[in-house]
């Protein structure tokens, strides 16, 4: 947790408005396992260097730097924010205000596409009956998504038929996809959209993870 807060992960994670707009820890142990993986990469690189040059070296890896590497998308966003003053993929755009640092962004995907977590039909009884859907920027990808969702009218609507337009109308995009998802379970949404090539995944709880044959 300390590495997460010092490396920028907590400041960019969590809800972006209201009483819940506070720095948030990840449920994943970002510092522990990630530091080991980074250290392993460093050791392997040092071994390769020794084989080539005959010289060894000291390998060091901190939890802070390991977590910082995982925040590289957010540091990229900081460079964009410094340059133009706003971030189009964030929920604050176009109507909200941006400060001088990357804000929290809820469940947006964060790298230029419209991703969000949607309630599915059993959400009232199952707190994890949600699905994550990404609406990509490419015209062909968008067309496939519209056909799968039954939103063919979006293909000719200037509010939605370009990526830049969707950035400006993201709340309407999210609301309509929510209407689609709420009629199905997370697994039904995942099966339907994945067949069409739409990036999608169910929110699996810890019990489901333990019994998933793919794990």
For the regions a protein language model found, what residue spans apply to each?
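Conserved PLP cofactor-binding pocket of PLP-dependent enzymes
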Residues: 194-215
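Beta-rich nucleic-acid/ligand-interaction surfaces
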Residues: 67, 168-169, 208-213
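A general structural signal marking secondary-structure boundaries and capping sites
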Residues: 13, 47-51, 152, 184, ...
């Amino acid at each position: 947790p300390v590495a997460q807060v010092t490396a920028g992960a907590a400041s960019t994670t969590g809800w972006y408005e209201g009483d819940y707009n506070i720095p948030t820890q990840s449920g994943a142990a970002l510092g522990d396992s990630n530091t080991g993986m980074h250290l392993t990469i460093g050791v392997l690189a040092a071994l390769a260097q020794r084989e080539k040059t005959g010289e060894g070296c000291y390998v060091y890896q901190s939890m802070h730097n390991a977590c910082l590497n995982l925040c590289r998308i957010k540091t990229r966003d900081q460079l964009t924010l410094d340059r133009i003053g706003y971030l189009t993929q964030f929920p604050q755009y176009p109507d909200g205000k941006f400060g001088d640092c990357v804000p929290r962004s809820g469940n947006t995907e964060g790298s230029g596409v419209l991703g969000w977590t949607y309630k599915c039909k059993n959400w009232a009884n199952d707190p994890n009956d949600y699905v994550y859907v990404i609406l990509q920027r490419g015209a062909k990808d968008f067309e496939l998504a519209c056909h799968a969702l039954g939103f063919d009218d979006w293909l000719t609507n200037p509010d939605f038929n370009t990526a830049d337009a969707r950035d400006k109308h993201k709340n309407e995009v999210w609301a309509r996809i929510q209407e689609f998802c709420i009629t199905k379970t997370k697994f039904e949404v995942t099966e339907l959209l994945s067949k069409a090539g739409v990036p999608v995944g169910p929110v699996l709880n810890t019990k489901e993870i333990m019994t998933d044959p793919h794990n």
